[in-house]
C-alpha cells in the first residue's frame, strides 16, 4: 500500500468524467488499497479514484460505527462502477466536506434514499438501498466520478466565492 497525493481544487482533473473499469485486476485491487491508506491518512470517510488523479470509476468508503464499548469498527467498502439507479423524492440535508476542498464545509440537499448498483472487488454485482450518511456519501463520491463537486449544489454566489478562494491559494502556492 502507498499513500497517494490528493488533488485539490482548482485542479481541472476533478472535472473529468471517470472511465468504467472493465475488469477487476491486481492493479485495481492495489489502487483500492492505496485509496484506503490515503483516505484513512487524510482522514476521510470516502475517496473517489479521480481525487488521486486516477480517472476510473472506483470509490472507497468507510462509515465506521462505534460498538457498545465505544470502539470504532472499520467497515471498508469498495464500489466499482457505482451508479444510482433510483432515488427518493424525499430530500435530506447534510453538512458535506471534501478531501479535495480542504477545510470547507457546507450544507447540501440530496435525495434522502437511493438504490445503488456496483461491482465489488470479487467482480460480483450488488444492488443496495442507502439512506442517511451512507446515501449522502455514496452520492457525493459518485458525483466525483462524473466531474461534479459538492460546491456545484451551492448558490452561484457561494460557489464562486469558494472557487475564487481556492484559485487564489493555488496561485500563491506556485
UniProtKB/Swiss-Prot annotation:
Gene Ontology biological process: co-translational protein modification; translation
Single GO term (MF): metal ion binding
Keywords noted in UniProt: Hydrolase, Iron, Metal-binding, Protein biosynthesis
Enzyme class: hydrolase
UniProt cofactor note: Binds 1 Fe(2+) ion.
Pfam families: Pep_deformylase
Entry keyword annotation includes Protein biosynthesis: yes
Assigned protein family: Belongs to the polypeptide deformylase family.
Name of the protein described by the UniProt record: Peptide deformylase
Gene label: def
Amino acid at each position: 500500500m502507498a499513500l497517494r497525493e490528493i488533488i485539490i481544487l482548482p485542479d481541472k482533473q476533478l472535472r473529468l468524467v471517470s472511465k468504467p473499469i472493465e475488469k477487476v485486476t491486481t492493479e485495481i485491487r492495489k489502487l483500492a488499497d492505496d485509496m484506503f491508506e490515503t483516505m484513512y491518512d487524510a482522514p476521510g470517510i470516502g475517496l473517489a479514484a479521480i481525487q488521486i488523479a486516477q480517472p476510473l470509476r472506483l470509490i472507497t468508503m468507510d462509515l465506521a460505527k462505534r460498538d457498545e464499548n465505544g470502539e470504532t469498527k472499520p467497515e471498508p467498502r469498495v464500489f466499482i462502477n457505482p451508479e444510482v439507479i433510483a432515488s427518493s423524492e424525499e430530500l435530506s440535508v447534510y453538512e458535506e466536506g471534501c478531501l479535495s476542498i480542504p477545510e470547507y464545509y457546507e450544507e447540501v440537499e440530496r435525495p434522502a434514499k437511493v438504490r445503488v448498483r456496483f461491482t465489488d472487488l470479487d467482480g460480483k454485482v450488488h444492488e443496495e438501498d442507502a439512506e442517511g450518511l451512507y446515501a449522502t456519501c455514496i452520492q457525493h463520491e459518485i458525483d466525483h466520478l462524473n466531474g461534479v463537486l459538492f460546491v456545484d449544489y451551492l448558490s452561484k454566489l457561494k460557489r464562486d466565492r469558494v472557487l475564487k478562494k481556492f484559485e487564489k491559494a493555488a496561485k500563491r502556492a506556485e
